[in-house]
Amino acid sequence: MKNEKLAKGEMNLNALFIGDKAENGQLYKDLLIDLVDEHLGWRQNYMPQDMPVISSQERTSESYEKTVNHMKDVLNEISSRMRTHSVPWHTAGRYWGHMNSETLMPSLLAYNFAMLWNGNNVAYESSPATSQMEEEVGHEFAHLMSYKNGWGHIVADGSLANLEGLWYARNIKSLPFAMKEVKPELVAGKSDWELLNMPTKEIMDLLESAEDEIDEIKAHSARSGKHLQAIGKWLVPQTKHYSWLKAADIIGIGLDQVIPVPVDHNYRMDINELEKIVRGLAEEQIPVLGVVGVVGSTEEGAVDSIDKIIALRDELMKDGIYYYVHVDAAYGGYGRAIFLDEDNNFIPYEDLQDVHEEYGVFKEKKEHISREVYDAYKAIELAESVTIDPHKMGYIPYSAGGIVIQDIRMRDVISYFATYVFEKGADIPALLGAYILEGSKAGATAASVWAAHHVLPLNVAGYGKLIGASIEGSHHFYNFLNDLTFKVGDKEIEVHTLTHPDFNMVDYVFKEKGNDDLVAMNKLNHDVYDYASYVKGNIYNNEFITSHTDFAIPDYGNSPLKFVNSLGFSDEEWNRAGKVTVLRAAVMTPYMNDKEEFDVYAPKIQAALQEKLEQIYDVK
């Protein structure tokens, strides 16, 4: 059957989800039944001369029927538990919490279908179909990042992808010392400081030239346990995901090597502070292993200025200083699709609004994306590696993380070959297991991601439209909150937003007018969370659901102080409380970009919040 390409603007997102009220439920069932029937037929048609091992007589036996009934009872219990205790994040406009939402129907169907084969993508021989799909997905990741010779693969989640990124950086940074030991002519004339500040491309070029001695050089690298502290500091923004600390622990460089970089009042890495740290370390002859920039921070959705991190590196190279750059775009990575045309070209900023209008990316023609965010996304192509999670803004079921590398040759620095699953030098169509951290991995995940990418291309015509819906929905929610006040008994409760969203996350607080006690405000917001989550009972009957987080001094320093001051709290009060508690909405719903639809839900949300505040203040 021919796969017809849709014309510009024809992609209808409403056809790709089961739907808030299961509007496409019958379509999902029909497609699933067709796929299951195909699998059953595939089983039946293999070696038709073989007789069935489960006989008709067996299927009518008493023990068989009892076993089937027992299985049904277990499944009924699972159904009861799932329906009773699950979070209804499929809802169009009532869930405003974690990074979860509707999942794409083609991804669900592909996962349902492929899991019947139970492929293990660690080895091609156990999963020929899905291993090839994963290899294609990896190249699609690379194209999304504008990597010309890149490579990528699926991992279980962003934490493992971050660990793998640090693994790459650690091993690459240590290679010059290994070359000095094994083949010193490769780095002749370089001081130890110069060896510690060699650009990644130069290192990979030298490694490639070593030919037959590559394995010996690798054996003398950081994988041997040598040079782990000597290779330098790992710099992360204060908005870092906690997985970076775990990665430093596991990878062996240690937590003492991790330095948090302050963020500005927009919760983006402060580039001036970054430069101070790097130059200060250089004065003490301490190298920087690498710098992490975040695109879509976990708690604010902030987009670090990747372009400025790269520009600073370029400037520092004049002084003989170099660092590896990893972009943690676990949340925001798929957002790059909104900037790519159908030929994978990065759209000029001055043309962006017109192109978005042409493809129906946004309902309203205006500046939805700032120049700062645009420049940050464009510069991702200059970073060595990127974390990207399909199970976040890819709208793909868990678990599906991903990592992408700029230069396919980099994968050799972490490769291991086990003869029983992959033979070194063998001509295997899709060799994954030798170049990844994980062992066994679900082929169904690869099929799920592959299906999503082929229904929704990774450009403005496909995922760009889905990402745009999310961004526009977040702007509606942000504007709605900014206009909110509540009369609760004799109290007036104001709503204040943290920052205008860089991407699609909205953080906000409730504040009692006239209150100058930050601890009391924090308690109010925690109480709102309790009433808007599983904490206070059956979440299925909750009319508004959200999440929360704390911005505390040990993690954020004084970055939240400007926001805290804007609420009327003094510096002394900030120091006394030590944190500010905010409510957090990752606005992933694909339905709230339509202002008319949002306006249907807005009074419902307001009424639900009014009720929760009255419960908190015990207003009868």
Curated annotation (Swiss-Prot):
GO biological process assignments: L-dopa metabolic process
Pathway(s) the chain acts in: Amino-acid metabolism
Active site feature: Y420
Family label: Belongs to the group II decarboxylase family. Tyrosine decarboxylase subfamily.
UniProt modified residues of type N6-(pyridoxal phosphate)lysine: K392
Full protein name: L-tyrosine decarboxylase
Organism classification: Bacteria, Bacillati, Bacillota, Bacilli, Lactobacillales
Biological role: Catalyzes the decarboxylation of L-tyrosine to produce tyramine. Plays a role in acid resistance since tyramine production via tyrosine decarboxylation appears to provide a cytosolic pH maintenance mechanism that helps the bacterium cope with acid stress such as that encountered in gastrointestinal tract (GIT) environments. Therefore, may contribute to the colonization of the human GIT by E.faecalis. Also involved in drug metabolism, being able to catalyze decarboxylation of levodopa (L-dopa) to dopamine. In gut microbiota this enzyme is in fact exclusively responsible for the decarboxylation of levodopa, and thus reduces in situ levels of levodopa in the treatment of Parkinson's disease.
Gene3D superfamilies (alphabetical): Type I PLP-dependent aspartate aminotransferase-like (Major domain)
Protein source organism: Enterococcus faecalis (strain ATCC 700802 / V583)
